[in-house]
């Protein structure tokens, strides 16, 4: 069986925006529905399903670290749904990225620090970035990148 789920003329909304729009399915909802259709029509012969979470990249390009993490978690939920649904079916599940880089956390934050927070020194003072603004933990990773 072959089908496509096209829900937008352009990019899909970010995952945190989906829930404010009643007519737009989330990545996990689209994945679940695709699995329903594929398992009903092609279970005997197997099937191929590609799920893309391209908004992770978009959020990173615009330095929206919290949103990039939210998008990564949405993809994680889609993979989790897939694993749960195809258990015992001898699946081959491949998760990859087109840029194949990792997310690093810099600035030596404390062990329990919120990675979306600011970098603090030993006595609690807030570290400043080159532009004089408070340095966020994730922003410290991007300090050497010039946009």
Language-model features: where?
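A post-motif C-terminal structural segment
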Residues: 1-147
